[in-house]
Amino acid sequence: ETRGWFLMRMPPFTLHTPNSLEEALSISGELADSGQEFDWVAGGTDLLPNYKWHLNSKPHVISLARVSELSEISETHIGAMVRLQDLVESDSVHPLISKVSSMIASVMLRRSGTVGGNICLDTRCFWFNQSEEWRESIEWCYKCDCGTGADCRVIPNQNTLCVATYQADLAPALMCLGASIHLASSGGTRSMSLPEFFQEDGITRNVLEPGELVTHLTLPEDAPDWVGDYQKLRQREAWDFPEAGVVVAWKKGKGAPSDLRVATTGLGSIPSLHQDEASAALADWEGEVSIEALAESIRKAVNPVLNTWFPPSYRRKMVKVLTKRASRGLMVR
């Protein structure tokens, strides 16, 4: 049999198409209880290409395309099935979220990609995001091919932690706005702050249990009081995942911001909210001097590894540049 990469054939799986959230959770509960693995598919812009590469495919896939309850959108509520382009075009969405959304991929992909899919985006690594034949040629990948006893190619001889990189855009902006994330399963619902949702492991990625999914995100009442900016490093402006991304958000005050938050993406296995660094800069605010100190502290706080296109040293240097660029609005009087 020819297994050439150019064939891009997905492995066989059973597709489930529930018409409601209740039905979706019933299906997921039955599969989870019987020990059968499955994936949720929303827009499919990340999952389906991964299936074509034979990256952790499952025997069952549950489509959320017909679950209308997950598509609600308002100033404080964003459903998991809201399309990314809807965030760009909606008048009810926070301006920072709209801007970040406009910088994700391309219009074509944003019309398919969803909020939940972006938040739950699989981590990436150039040893992982390759064809099955390529991975076999280097004796497999720890993240994808655990059953082979493969070693991690980024940090060899440890095989206790996958360091694949989280390269989605929405999470740092939502963190800076104080968003909460809401999950559901056949056993009930639970909620948490967005930073609590992520788990620093390139394989597990987050706290979702088998049979559980993201239903929506909510913003606090003071979200409209926050303004900010997002700056992103990538190879091509109209396509690529962030090699580094920085959100700086603040509440306006007299002569200085009254509150300040900074979050990053593309620099580790999870997006990070840098509250200590932001608080230190805010404690003795001196305008450009404080911005320079903030940018340097964020550079020191991140620790990227060699598993994306740009080398870690360059990405760390650019984090300082991106932080200063995202802070320019702080100097507008």
Label every model-predicted segment.
Residues 3-333:
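C-terminal structural segment of proteins
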